[in-house]
Regions:
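Long beta-strand-rich cores associated with HINT superfamily self-processing modules
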Residues: 457-481
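Gly/Pro-rich hinge or "lid" segments in bacterial periplasmic/extracellular proteins
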Residues: 151-211
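Periplasmic-binding protein-like
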Residues: 269-311, 354, 441-446
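Surface-exposed binding/hinge segments that line
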Residues: 85, 122-169
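Ligand-site clamp/hinge motif
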Residues: 195-244
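Extracytoplasmic/peripheral linker and loop segments enriched in polar/acidic and small residues
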Residues: 372-374, 398-461, 481
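Structural transition elements
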Residues: 298-337, 353
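N-terminal lobe/hinge region of extracytoplasmic solute-binding protein
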Residues: 32-82, 111, 182
Length: 481
């Protein structure tokens, strides 16, 4: 009798393991993501943080780097007659606490961003460079620059420049606000964010899904949950699932360019790397495809240009020569200038995982002694260093100027082209000048492009209308069930 009971219990247990998941709740979307580093929008640099804050906030505008097209969002218009004096007209809007979004909201928020030195502060201090920002009236922001610039629409579309409510601007309780953020976007956070667990987004305008349950977890487990039908969207595809995604989710997965890229920066002031021939030799010795499949875990593409797709003014034809892997040519270039051999590649925070295998690859392909070492607290390096750039805006000016600064590259023609692109009257004119500046960097090669990051998501059969953008990732407000 006892054995029959055990058999029955085992049968029931097996049936429970094999049972289909509970039916999904109507109107509720479930989304898996990593733990965001912060939900303070001006300090967000990670993909998970941008996904959440892009649902909680609406930026002034969307800017497409490839076409130069500006789509007003929280602003009704962004205009200038001389590219020095800019006027931003706001569309009517409210924060989730019911208070109005005004021009003063932006003025005070931007002052706080600059004062707190958050990740997006450089957009204001280094790129916008305004002499004065004022609220002309409750719905009008007036900006006066220190020079003519046509890049203002691209800069003001930065997701880190969204407004904060008066309550936190008065209290300065930034940590508390990051746990329970209040934005001006289509979704509000229902309660506080629960670290390690997630949170619930609520939409009250009657459009799209009314509720999104955000679930923090492991990307591989989330991928498998979508496949099993217990999760609607997984916002990251780990390398271990890369090869099976087409078979598992035919027509229900997407990749998109992220505003992030990796570079090898050369110390152009150092005698051994002052010759561009040496720098080109090292660039040709990098097996980018091996890095992509190995250390980068299929989360990036081998670089094809200096400007990554998320930041480029249109598509570049073909792969740039320094982006190619040609070990024989690289060795020949080093032999041509009698490179003495022996080099250290320095890595900073967050780049060691790919810097070490890159160094091993250079040693093998170029047949010179190359070692990896943590970057010391000095600007005077005697070897190349790895650089992981996380962009705050879709303007190429941000990246090109940052790369020149990182390498110590100083050239009058490059500076003139960059300044002319910044001042250009139209996106087309600016794009041509940015390409000239990019081509010059590819010729002189103070930095070698290594990889550009991409996002990759999968979704269940009941999710529809999934679209993506470089900075927000998946547009949660566009999904329907």
């Amino acid at each position: 009798m006892r054995s029959r009971v055990l058999v029955l219990l085992a049968a029931f247990a097996l049936a429970g393991c094999m049972a289909a998941p509970d039916p999904s709740r109507p109107g509720v979307l479930t989304v898996g993501l990593r733990e965001p580093a912060t939900l303070l929008p001006a300090d967000v640099t990670d993909q998970a943080g941008r996904l959440v804050t892009s649902a909680l906030w609406t930026p002034l505008a969307d800017y497409d780097a490839a076409s130069g097209k500006l789509t007003p969002r929280a602003a009704s218009s962004i205009t200038s007659a001389d590219r020095v004096h800019w006027t931003v007209k706001l569309a009517p809007g409210r924060f989730h606490d019911g208070t109005p979004v005004t021009a003063q909201s932006y003025v005070d928020t931007w002052a706080a961003v600059a004062a707190e030195h958050w990740a997006s502060s450089a957009v204001l201090t280094n790129l916008l460079r305004a002499k004065e920002i004022t609220a002309a009236d409750p719905s009008t922001i007036s900006i006066t620059l220190d020079r003519p610039s046509g890049q203002v629409p691209a800069l003001l579309s930065a997701p880190g420049l969204v407004p904060l409510p008066a309550s936190v601007l008065a209290s300065h309780d930034w940590n508390g606000f990051a746990r329970a953020p209040v934005g001006n976007g289509p979704f509000r956070l229902n309660g506080a964010w629960q670290p390690g667990s997630g949170g619930t987004l609520q939409r009250d305008d009657g459009r799209g899904v009314t509720q999104i349950d955000l679930k923090v977890g492991d990307p591989a487990a989330q991928y498998d949950a979508v496949k099993a039908g217990t999760l609607d969207v997984a916002t990251e595809v780990p390398g271990s699932r890369h090869e099976s995604v087409d078979a598992d989710f035919a027509g229900r997965h997407a990749t998109w360019a992220l505003p992030r890229a990796g570079y090898l920066v050369f110390p152009v002031a150092d005698g051994r790397f002052s010759d561009a021939t040496v720098r080109h030799g090292f660039a040709l010795g990098v097996d980018r495809s091996a890095l992509e499949a190995g250390a980068l875990d299929h989360q990036a593409e081998p670089a094809k240009a200096l400007l990554p797709p998320a930041d480029a003014p249109g598509e570049r034809t073909g792969t740039c020569r320094p982006c190619s892997f040609d070990a024989a040519a690289g060795k020949a270039l080093l032999a041509q200038v009698a490179f003495p051999g022996g080099a250290t590649v320095y890595f900073g925070p967050g780049t060691e995982t790919w810097a070490r295998p890159l160094t091993v690859g250079l040693h093998k392909s170029l047949d010179v002694s190359v070692t990896a070492q943590g970057k010391p607290a000095t600007n005077a390096l005697d070897g190349p260093s790895t650089l992981d750039v996380k962009l705050a805006t879709p303007s190429p000016y941000e990246l090109l100027s940052a790369l020149a600064t990182a390498s110590g590259y100083a050239d009058d023609v490059f500076r003139e082209n960059l300044a002319a692109a910044d001042a250009a009257a139209t996106p087309d004119e600016a794009g041509q000048l940015y390409r000239l500046a990019e081509n010059q960097l590819l010729r002189d090669l103070p930095v070698a492009p290594i990889w550009s990051a991409h996002g990759h998501a999968v979704w269940s059969a009941r999710a529809h209308g999934v679209t993506t953008t470089p900075f927000a990732g998946i547009t949660l407000a566009a999904i329907t069930l």
